[in-house]
Amino acid sequence: MTTLFTLSHRFQRIPRNIYRYLFVMAALGFTIDGGIYSVLLNLYVLRLGYGPEFIGTLNCVGLFVFAALSLPLGAVRRFSSHQMLIIGLSCIFTGMMGLPLGQWLPEAFHSGWLVATRILTHIGLAFFFVHTAPFVMSITKGEWHSRALSLQSATLALAGFMGGLVGGVLPGLLGDWLHLPTSDPTPYQYPLLLAGIFLAPALLILTRLTAVSTPEPPAAEADEMLLPQPSKQRVLPFTVTQVVLLIIAVRILQITVVGVINTFANVYLDDGLKVSTDLIGVLTAVSRLVGVPIALSVPYLVSRWGNYRLVIWTTLFTVALMIPMAFIPHWAVAGAATIGIGSISSLRYLSFLVFSLSLVPEEKRALISGAGEMSIGLGFAFVSFVGGYLITWYGYPALFLFGAVLTLAGTVLFWLFFRKVK
């Protein structure tokens, strides 16, 4: 009873701005960041008649644009983080609504339309996610910084779970209603349109957010947030420029396994193992659901082990899950990897984010955030482009081994670069 009362008290103390912000993040999680789009987009493209190489190229182009914009956007000072989020979400909304509409164009325009709308969506994602951490810090204060980021990860995971379930079920239901087989693209087109519509209220709420800092929590709550604060700069043997370059190099490699899962897991399950869309949706959803308690446990895990160790251990864990996929072509093995890698991604992402932000002065946080997002985009773009051709030329096992080796290399580099950081 005491525990329930304490949890209730903590949620009552969450500032209104954070509740509104979390609603926006929930809409993103339900639709594009782990939800409907994550389950159905690649399957939709397959049913339009394209193969893994085009899917890889399509994802690569969007992610490369995301990567190219992330670092410059992190250095922008003319616009506030709030304005950048509004611009970003507007582009995401337009791109998501536009992509499935291309099915009604002449077939000769399909590929170009898919690429153009995917690029617009990733332009929006770059504007948005580069400035999420700085924006959270502008609407919170002190101990709320890392707590809000932890709540953000949990919200994305829970919303992604719900969106994954909905995305897995809708094509079958719509196919029955429209008397169309699930091999037809139309039962996938309408859920993608629905995902875009769900973002409209989030965009409205985002415009009403104000960058007003909340009061410092009382001393009694100071121990509740156990994440190290980025304002406490570490002693480094590197310049800020060197830190940026190191973060980019390490993260591009470390993110490879996650990129393989995010881009090709549903393609492998559908095209390689002939798994039903319902089961693909369930596996994706469960990976997000398991991520909720993991995200909420971040403060405790960081206080127990530290961000540096968590980055290394979580990355090695993803490598250990990917290797069996190369040798055992079974949906249970692929499902375990999808769930394990997807669920732990919030812990890996947040621990790396807080660790990297703590390496630089406060005025350089947006730059570091941009460098981190750019490296994720570059890593995913590289995996998407190379992965599509690896599958075509050598099969899925070659892709899985490729991802595991590069991620392991990134972990070794992270250990070498930062093991002596105090």
Name what the model sees in each region.
Residues 5-68, 243-276, 280-283:
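Helix-loop boundary and gating motifs at the non-cytosolic
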Residues 95, 108-128, 252, 333-347:
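Hydrophobic core of transmembrane alpha-helices in multi-pass small-molecule transporters
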Residues 57-75, 285-297:
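Central cavity-lining transmembrane alpha-helices of secondary-active solute carriers
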